[in-house]
Amino acid sequence: MRLNIPTKPEDALWTDDQWKAIQANGNNILVAAAAGSGKTAVLVTRIIEKLINETENLNVDELLIVTFTNVSAAEMKYRIGKSLEEALVQNPESVHLKKQVALLNYASISTLHSFCLEIIRKHYFEADIDPNFRLIEPIESSMIRDEVLEDLLEKEYSIENNEGFFHLVESFTGDRSDAELHTLISKLYDFSRANPNPDLWLEQMVSFYDTQAITSITELPYFPIIKEDIQLRINQAKSYLLTAIDYANENNGPAPYLSTLENDLAQINTLSSISWDNWQDVKFGFESIDFKRIPALKNKADFDEEYVEEAKKFRDAAKKEVKNVLIDWFSREEENYLSDLEKMKPDIKTLSELVKKFAENFFEEKQQRGVLDFNDLEHLALKILLKNGAPSDVANSYKKQFKEVLIDEYQDTNMVQETILLLVTNSNDTKGNLFMVGDVKQSIYRFRLAEPTLFMAKYQEYQQDGEGSGIRIDLSQNFRSRKEVLDATNFIFHQLMDKHIAEIDYDEAAELTLGASFPEANNMATELLLIDMKSEEKESEDELSPQELQKNQVESRAIATKIREMIDNKFPIYDKKLQQNRPIQYRDIVILARAMTSAPDMEEAMKIKDIPFYANNNSGYFETTEVATMIALMKVIDNPYQDISLAAVLRSPIIGLNEEELGQIRMAKKKGYFFDAMLAYKDITVSDAANKISRFITQLNNWRELSIRENLTALIWQIYQETNFYEFVGGLPGGKQRQANLRALYDRANQYEKTSFRGLFRFVRFVERLEVRGDDLGTAKTLGEKEDVVRMMTIHASKGLEFPVVIVSGLSRKFNMRDIYSKTLLDKDYGFASNYRDIEKMIVYPTIMQQAIKQKKYREMIAEEMRVLYVALTRAEEKLILTATVPDFEKTSKNWLQVSNQQETILPAAIRAKAKCYLDWIGNATIRHSHFKELLCEEKIKTLPTDMKLQVEIKTKEMFLTDDLEKEKSDNWMENVKAHKQVPVKSPYKDEIERFMHYQYKDEEATGIRAKQSVTELKRQFSLQDSWSDTSILKEFQKVSLDRPKFLQQNKLSATEIGTAMHTLMQAVPLDDKPTEKDLVSLLQLMREKDILTEAQIKAINVNQIIAFFESALGKTVLQKKDKVKREVPFSYLLPAAKLYNQTNLDEHVLIQGVVDSMIEEEDSIILIDYKTDKIEGRYDNWEAAEKVMKERYQIQIKLYAEAIQAISRKKVSHAYLYFFDGQHICQINIEEGI
């Protein structure tokens, strides 16, 4: 269609694209507005132009304007109102304008949640809900959710023959609790609610496990993900080998390697032409890769050692890529991968039904309480707007009402919100009325289930000329930042973003162009500050060796140093209001971070440099001493029989007891609750501590009565008044903040009591749940937004904001991969994926679906993190500083040099996709800048043409320890150390510290006793001596026996590993008849197919030794009494430590754990049999000599077995035998003597 755009006035300040966005009509419009492009101004102007144009006869209440936040909605309404009033001043007689001012308060300018709430309140009867509902906060909703879910699971447990549910519990939970299932149901519920039809989404989730009609992995719906991942790894292996070949071709490079490397590359290239129609062909292709041994270099001195090592390193990396493909995608047979999914289908169906039941019960419970939560708003609005799959009468009325629907931040919309918006617009007509503004490069809310693909689909579908289903307008001109900031952003993201990795191309339409005007300046180059954490090899003899500071601490000090330099040097900042430069102020600087974990270190570093600092941190509230003390006191008031909370209160300033007095309380009553011990101490002791306790008990009783009579806030205020705790914390360091935290506790208790929950017990439980979930509330704010301080905030919190100087910190912080590597994965397209747990064998396998979804989620995470970085870099107006630590700059820069010969602007996909942190991207991008090339003196680097001004600084961590060293020198600290003199102590706690240091623990012997010990470990320890009394055993208890690493297990199996294999086979041999060699070989083959034993283990097993056992008298007895035989019997047995150590003063116990190989359980007695794989033949002269050694070695183990089994079964162990496979010897152990 032809765009009828009015001619732009000559004096208009708008760009052509902005003018087009303001004036375009006649179809759906998507405005792709880059960072700083003035999208909000364009959106407001478009609305105002429509309203003041009386020929359009458009009223403000005929527009639906949807914003992302309530703040944005309020600002939008303010701007529109102000513009209307200004227009009315110009045309005071306009009835139309007066009408718009009057209607403004009734206009639909809000978040989508608010619009949904408006729909529900007007049409509640269509949703069949009580019109007097109350909208609850997420915290109250989560509490109701927990109660409903606990009730649901309890009911499921109580249903008889509920086999499907119990199998699900066994498959997806641990041994100790069903907390994992609780979390899983809750997550699935949340995820399903991001879909217009949650029940349908859950049913589709089950369908992905139906593989009966599927004959090959290539037919799976997510096979393209698998294929793409494998191809990416093939390309990465190629890249590694090409880099290795480059090193081999260097002067003095390892040229003898070339033939092998080129052969490797040829093999990898064959994989590019592999047929993807047959999974077995793909598998065969990778299994056929044979990396030959690299030739030895005869005259090593002729070759550059660095080139040799780098060539080897990159070849090894290529080999690892191929190996990982085999591990990740071909570790199991194709039919096993498919059958695993089919076996899981019943569990997934049960899980799906559970989530549906929970959703129904949860909504019913909220209805009974007369409340709704934010999730309900969208789905109830959808229920009202959609009837039988078509727009309802209500939806059609909104379509008639709204002449245009305008959406801000469209890139953060999800599927439910999209469906709602489409139901109230004419978007499906030939003349749509949907106006969407956003920037998909700034879509950073996928964790809130935002769906950026909605934006991208329209971006690709809509045309700039208006033909087709919509109009696309690109706003790329940036009116926020200096050219230096824009050049840096473009230089980096031209190399990073494309549709393949970032889900969008960073092309000419997407790049930022200069729109703002700043005076020329020479010091605005983008800075990359890297701190090398590698310690200097030699320290100055007259200085203390620097302490090993954590990365966050060093980087924080480097940033503080940089800020102090800028402040001291009066770094110039352009003031847009004054239209001239002025010296930089603290408020001009913001530090951005992906997370706030480094905030405490940053605060400490700023204190050192005397820089006022404020961190917008939403965590740490419950950890503050004053709040933790109050929470502990409330727990004690609710239930005084809570030892830890009671001890915390007694030790706190509220009561003021010390550790020694707490110890005396416990001695007053050694066993039982600490509260009872406190009462006993009060009654038998006359002391200051007893007086404090008496007063506390009186107060406690009063508070307990008050908690019943009054509300929670009255109780908290009474505690503040009676104890003077509020005044006390005000006198401590940071007293203003501490008092603000206590006031916040009072306020939050007040908010809590406005919910549907009441009482102290529920509040305490509510706080405990917040702590367990990590839903901290953040310390109270004591600083205003306008104060002159350096601010630190997350990148997410900075979205939509701008600052003169931006320091993007923590670029080497690893991406959060926790969700990707969790046991269960959720995906909008494929539902739910997890491991397959074989309950009978107790073996867990990764499923092909889990592997595929993991790769999909990883790629989505990489794309999201790339967009987060884009948001961070585009916050800067004038100066951009990037900071990171590197473990060893020399090695790190060599890794970046892998792209030095890259011809294309875009970096290789594999390098971008495998990034572990932002620095992996920034390092590989900036190393192709001429400044970096000069810094490294690397002529082979192929630089990219750019206007970007870059300044790279490499600092050592020792540079930021000066403050500590100067302080130490001022205290004559080093001089005293060198003179072997006592270091002066200025602490007021000197005496108390010395008392701590000289404290002697009276039960020191008990510290050497483990609470739990295996019989095997005890046997090994006791083989060192003949009695239990030797105290050298204590040291043995501290030793840890570790399994051999995987790379060592590839060699010959150890004796222990062979023994494990023999025991595993003995556990599986059928006892119906004496096994033959054929029987055992078949059994071993089956165990290999089911991954119970490895090929190496099977080869180590001598089946003739197994046959010989069943031919022995002991073996025949086992076969004869097969119905009474139990194998691999685990047990736990509590044994007095005094018995083990022969020390009567030990009042401790040791939990002994072990597994009996085999036992024959008669009616009144038991025979124990333990199999041994010790080497006998050829090691001892005769069996008598061997028997003596074996009895000494194993008698403790067998006696412990016997004592434990007798105590547990209450049957006498009549006989105990050791059977040695080597030589077929039977050894009877005398158990009558006991231990």
From Swiss-Prot:
Occurrences of domain UvrD-like helicase C-terminal (ranges): 509-800
Classification via InterPro entries: AddA (IPR014152), DNA_helicase_UvrD-like_C (IPR014017), DNA_helicase_UvrD/REP (IPR000212), P-loop_NTPase (IPR027417), PDDEXK-like_dom_sf (IPR011604), PDDEXK_AddAB-type (IPR038726), Restrct_endonuc-II-like (IPR011335), UvrD-like_ATP-bd (IPR014016)
GO cellular component terms, A-Z: cytosol; DNA helicase complex
Catalysed reaction, written as an equation: Couples ATP hydrolysis with the unwinding of duplex DNA by translocating in the 3'-5' direction; ATP + H2O = ADP + phosphate + H(+)
Keyword GTP-binding among record annotations: no
Methyltransferase found in the keyword field: no
Gene Ontology molecular functions: 3'-5' DNA helicase activity; 3'-5' exonuclease activity; ATP binding; ATP hydrolysis activity; double-stranded DNA binding
Domain annotation UvrD-like helicase ATP-binding: ranges: 12-482
Residues reported in the UniProt entry to bind ATP: A33, A34, A35, G36, S37, G38, K39, T40
Gene Ontology BP, a term: double-strand break repair via homologous recombination
Pfam families: PDDEXK_1, UvrD-helicase, UvrD_C
Keyword entries, A-Z: ATP-binding, DNA damage, DNA repair, DNA-binding, Exonuclease, Helicase, Hydrolase, Isomerase, Nuclease, Nucleotide-binding
EC number(s) stated in the UniProt entry for this protein: 3.1.-.-, 5.6.2.4
Required co-factors: Mg(2+)
Function of the molecule: The heterodimer acts as both an ATP-dependent DNA helicase and an ATP-dependent, dual-direction single-stranded exonuclease. Recognizes the chi site generating a DNA molecule suitable for the initiation of homologous recombination. The AddA nuclease domain is required for chi fragment generation; this subunit has the helicase and 3' -> 5' nuclease activities.
PANTHER family hit by this protein: ATP-DEPENDENT HELICASE_NUCLEASE SUBUNIT A, UVRD / RECB / PCRA DNA HELICASE FAMILY MEMBER
Subunit and partners: Heterodimer of AddA and AddB/RexB.
Stated family: Belongs to the helicase family. AddA subfamily.
Protein name: ATP-dependent helicase/nuclease subunit A
UniProt organism field: Listeria innocua serovar 6a (strain ATCC BAA-680 / CLIP 11262)
Origin organism lineage: Bacteria, Bacillati, Bacillota, Bacilli, Bacillales
Gene for this chain: addA
